[in-house]
Amino acid sequence: MSKIAKTAIISPKAEINKGVEIGEFCVIGDGVKLDEGVKLHNNVTLQGHTFIGKNTEIFPFAVLGTQPQDLKYKGEYSELIVGEDNLIREFCMINPGTEGGIKKTLIGDKNLLMAYVHVAHDCVIGSHCILANGVTLAGHIEIGDYVNIGGLTAIHQFVRIAKGCMIAGKSALGKDVPPYCTVEGNRAFIRGLNRHRMRQLLESKDIDFIYALYKRLFRPIPSLRESAKLELEEHANNPFVKEICSFILASSRGVAYKSSEYSSEEKQEE
């Protein structure tokens, strides 16, 4: 049975599933759909064609699904889809997609978006991610699974961040980040690999292989793209080579890499 505060303003066109809790002074618009077990604390605003997945909890003064902050937006149909078991903390803002993008903003499962996180139009966020306080995502950003982004970090539109990456706090990131890398700075560049996340997700032999692969990729000569092509030719059946090198070759913004910033010896630090 759902528990809905008397002061909540809910459109009769909204779809509220069983077991939903809606706190005082929430505002829920026409196209909103809340799956089972969703919990809205007081003063949450949900608008537009917004779907919230099972057991997601949204804290006070978060605003989801309102018109994208894009001057090209002319009221066309677009969506915001949030998966299951997410925690969305106070004052977060998440916009739906636009005609100029994929027409939707997508957030996976089991993510934590801390206070004041901003997710702009057409972003795609995977699962098991943590976005710390004040993280700002511009439009069209893609973030893989198991990514951590430190507080007060700003990320340029169209940037891609692959699985298992760590972005240090107060960074300004304008280029793509391949799998399992750690970046830091303004502008942010790769500083090494995310050992902590790799140990959680991978076997020791695979970690060793990835370290050796990045050491080869980040040689001064040939270029990073040429190195990625060579690795794909020589190790075409290896899933890690495919994942990492294909990501590098697909980059349109370039990779956040400077040879002077990357230490291939950090693996020895245990």
From Swiss-Prot:
Pfam family, one: Hexapep
InterPro entries per UniProt: Acetyltransf_C, Acetyltransf_C_sf, Hexapep, Lipid_A_LpxA, Trimer_LpxA-like_sf
Top-rank taxon, per record: Bacteria
Pathway assigned to this chain's UniProt record: Glycolipid biosynthesis; lipid IV(A) biosynthesis; lipid IV(A) from (3R)-3-hydroxytetradecanoyl-[acyl-carrier-protein] and UDP-N-acetyl-alpha-D-glucosamine: step 1/6
EC number, UniProt record: 2.3.1.129
Single GO MF annotation: acyl-[acyl-carrier-protein]-UDP-N-acetylglucosamine O-acyltransferase activity
GO biological process: lipid A biosynthetic process
Reaction(s) catalysed by this chain's protein: a (3R)-hydroxyacyl-[ACP] + UDP-N-acetyl-alpha-D-glucosamine = a UDP-3-O-[(3R)-3-hydroxyacyl]-N-acetyl-alpha-D-glucosamine + holo-[ACP]
GO cellular component: cytoplasm; membrane
Keywords annotated in UniProt: Acyltransferase, Cytoplasm, Lipid A biosynthesis, Lipid biosynthesis, Lipid metabolism, Repeat, Transferase
Entry's localization field: Cytoplasm
Protein family: Belongs to the transferase hexapeptide repeat family. LpxA subfamily.
Subunit structure: Homotrimer.
Function statement: Involved in the biosynthesis of lipid A, a phosphorylated glycolipid that anchors the lipopolysaccharide to the outer membrane of the cell.
HAMAP family, per database record: LpxA (MF_00387)
NCBIfam families, sorted: lipid_A_lpxA (TIGR01852), PRK05289.1 (NF003657)
PANTHER family referenced in this protein's UniProt entry, alphabetically: ACYL-[ACYL-CARRIER-PROTEIN]--UDP-N-ACETYLGLUCOSAMINE O-ACYLTRANSFERASE, ACYL-[ACYL-CARRIER-PROTEIN]--UDP-N-ACETYLGLUCOSAMINE O-ACYLTRANSFERASE, MITOCHONDRIAL-RELATED
Listed name of the protein: Acyl-[acyl-carrier-protein]--UDP-N-acetylglucosamine O-acyltransferase
Organism of derivation: Helicobacter pylori (strain G27)
